[in-house]
Each structure stands twice: as C-alpha cells, then as structure tokens.
C-alpha cells in the first residue's frame, strides 16, 4: 500500500498535470470505486468543475475543485496516470476523466480496493474519513510531550501497532514504522506506555526524518508502486530493516529478523533494538 511518501509524490506529480483544468466528462468503468453517491450522480457533480489544486491529508489525495473536493485513497494498487491527449483505457483502468483541453486522467487499480468520493468545503475535514485522522508527524502540534501523553495511556499496546493507528499518528505505514523504530533504537513489541520521554522524542524525530528522506527519493517501490510519470521510488535502497530479513544489520552486523505483530510483518534488529 502506498504510504505517506508515495502519496505525497503522487500529489506533487499530479499537481502541475491537472491543476487549472476543467472536467468535460467522466467515464466510470467500474462503479465499485465510487463511494457515497450513485455513479451517475457522482459524475454529474464533477462535470464542469475545475481542479484548482491537488493536496494530501495522510494517505488521501484531495483534488480541490471549484466547489468541494474529490477525495481518493489508492489502497493497495491504485495509480493515477495523466495523458496529454485522449488515450484508450487498459484492462485495469476504472475511471477516466476527460478535460476540456482533451487531456485525460486515468485511474488504474489491479486490486480494485481504491476509493473515490466527493466532499463539500464544509464537510471535508468534519466527516469521515478525514475527520478520523490525527495530526501528521510534520505538524508542529505533534510535540514530544503530546505524543508521550497519548502513548502513556496505552498500557498493553505495542509501540509498533500504536504508530500504525492513524488516529494517533497519521501517515506511517508498515515500512516507515519499522524504519522509524530501528533508527530510534526501540523494539517493536515494547508497550507504548513504557517508552521514556527521551525515547518518544527519538521516535518522533526519526519518523519525520524517515518520511522526509523517503519523499525526497520518490517513496519506496517494494512491489509495483510507480508515480504518475511511471517512475519508481528509490528509498527502498536505503531501508535498514524492512524487507531485509536474514541480511546483516548495516549498523551492527547482526541478522535482521522478522515476526508477526498485530497481523503485520515486522522487521527489526534484535541487537540494535533490544527489549
């Protein structure tokens, strides 16, 4: 699943490609993608709207319209591809947006798990899904003290599963939680409440650093992720533990191990991240 760095990269590529363009028509080839409205009504609301910006909130892509927002979540395999001219949809193309200049935006999704829905300016941040999200790691309101207070209430919850909770800390998925905890020197099974203030500060600091580095490198392509230009990310070349099971730790030489935690594959170095 694309995580925050990948979604941020997608937004940065889409912004210059679609901003300022007016929607002439929309073809919904698979109605399963559309949420909240009948597909015909959904299309009716979009025609004539101009995309004024492309924003991101957590892992959601927000197409800012003249009136409201088109909210998209890529889930496992969703991808957007802009084309300068009309282009035939391929097997896994599920939505085609045609603009008045005859350029198009295709949404492709092999797994069909992605979603699109409309929100008004008034409801975009006050109704699910965005209303359920916490602050992002970059937000100045995410202080060490505030995060420490939240984690102190989690007496039995592992720090790994706590950081994956988007109502606690938005934008960290499996890859970047594993990398954050490695860099912070915190074992993933530690109870969240057991972390000292200093450890929480390291986790917060490293989370921001990991995400910024991943964004700079276009995200991580582990399986099939590609941005709207078709380019793959390169941060996977910098991963210390994720996907490195059985390899020597680049810091200490100990073998990287993998376990299941909360149903998620979890990678760590037992020497650098002691319990």
UniProtKB/Swiss-Prot annotation:
Q: Which InterPro entries match?
A: DNA_glyclase/AP_lyase_DNA-bd, DNA_glyclase_Znf_dom_DNA_BS, Formamido-pyr_DNA_Glyclase, FPG_cat, MutM-like_N-ter, Ribosomal_uS13-like_H2TH, Znf_DNA_glyclase/AP_lyase, Znf_FPG/IleRS
Offer one example of a GO biological process linked to this entry.
base-excision repair
Q: Name one GO molecular function term.
A: class I DNA-(apurinic or apyrimidinic site) endonuclease activity
User: SUPFAM superfamilies, per this entry?
Assistant: Glucocorticoid receptor-like (DNA-binding domain), N-terminal domain of MutM-like DNA repair proteins, S13-like H2TH domain
As recorded in UniProt, its EC number(s) are 3.2.2.23, 4.2.99.18
Q: How does it assemble?
A: Monomer.
What reaction gets catalysed by this protein? Hydrolysis of DNA containing ring-opened 7-methylguanine residues, releasing 2,6-diamino-4-hydroxy-5-(N-methyl)formamidopyrimidine; 2'-deoxyribonucleotide-(2'-deoxyribose 5'-phosphate)-2'-deoxyribonucleotide-DNA = a 3'-end 2'-deoxyribonucleotide-(2,3-dehydro-2,3-deoxyribose 5'-phosphate)-DNA + a 5'-end 5'-phospho-2'-deoxyribonucleoside-DNA + H(+)
Q: Which HAMAP family match?
A: Fapy_DNA_glycosyl
What positions does UniProt annotate as the active site of this protein?
Answer: 2 (schiff-base intermediate with dna), 3 (proton donor), 59 (proton donor), 264 (proton donor)
Record's keyword annotation contains Nucleus: no
Q: Name one Pfam family in it.
A: H2TH
Q: How is the cofactor bound?
A: Binds 1 zinc ion per subunit.
UniProt function note? Involved in base excision repair of DNA damaged by oxidation or by mutagenic agents. Acts as a DNA glycosylase that recognizes and removes damaged bases. Has a preference for oxidized purines, such as 7,8-dihydro-8-oxoguanine (8-oxoG). Has AP (apurinic/apyrimidinic) lyase activity and introduces nicks in the DNA strand. Cleaves the DNA backbone by beta-delta elimination to generate a single-strand break at the site of the removed base with both 3'- and 5'-phosphates.
**Family to which the UniProt record says this protein belongs:** Belongs to the FPG family.
Protein name (database record): Formamidopyrimidine-DNA glycosylase
Give cofactor(s), names only: Zn(2+)
Where are the zinc-finger regions (FPG-type) in this chain?
A: 240-274
Query: Any idea which positions bind DNA?
Result: 92, 111, 155
Q: Which UniProt keywords apply?
A: DNA damage, DNA repair, DNA-binding, Glycosidase, Hydrolase, Lyase, Metal-binding, Multifunctional enzyme, Zinc, Zinc-finger
């Amino acid at each position: 699943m694309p995580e925050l760095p990948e979604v941020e990269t997608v937004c940065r590529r889409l912004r210059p490609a679609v901003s300022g363009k007016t929607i002439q028509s929309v073809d919904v080839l698979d109605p399963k993608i559309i949420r909240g409205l009948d597909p015909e009504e959904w299309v009716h609301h979009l025609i004539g709207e101009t995309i004024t910006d492309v924003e991101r909130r957590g892992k959601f892509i927000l197409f800012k319209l003249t009136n409201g927002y088109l909210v998209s979540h890529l889930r496992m395999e969703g991808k957007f591809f802009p084309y300068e001219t009309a282009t035939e949809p391929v097997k896994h193309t599920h939505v085609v947006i045609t603009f008045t200049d005859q350029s198009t935006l295709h949404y492709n999704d092999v797994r069909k798990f992605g979603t699109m829905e409309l929100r008004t300016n008034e409801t975009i941040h006050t109704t699910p899904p965005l209303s359920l999200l916490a602050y992002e790691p970059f937000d100045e309101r995410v202080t060490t003290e505030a995060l420490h207070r939240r984690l102190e209430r989690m007496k039995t919850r592992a720090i790994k599963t706590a950081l994956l909770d988007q109502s606690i800390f938005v934008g960290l998925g499996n890859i970047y939680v594993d990398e954050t905890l490695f860099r912070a020197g915190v074992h993933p099974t530690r109870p969240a409440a057991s972390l000292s203030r200093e450890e929480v500060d390291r986790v917060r600091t490293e989370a921001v650093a990991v995400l910024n580095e991943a964004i700079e490198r276009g995200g991580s392509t582990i399986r099939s992720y590609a941005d709207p230009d078709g380019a793959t990310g390169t941060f996977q070349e910098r991963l210390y533990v994720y996907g490195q099971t059985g390899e020597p730790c680049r810091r200490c030489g100990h073998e990287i191990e993998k376990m299941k935690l909360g149903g998620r594959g979890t990678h760590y170095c037992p020497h650098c991240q002691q319990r």
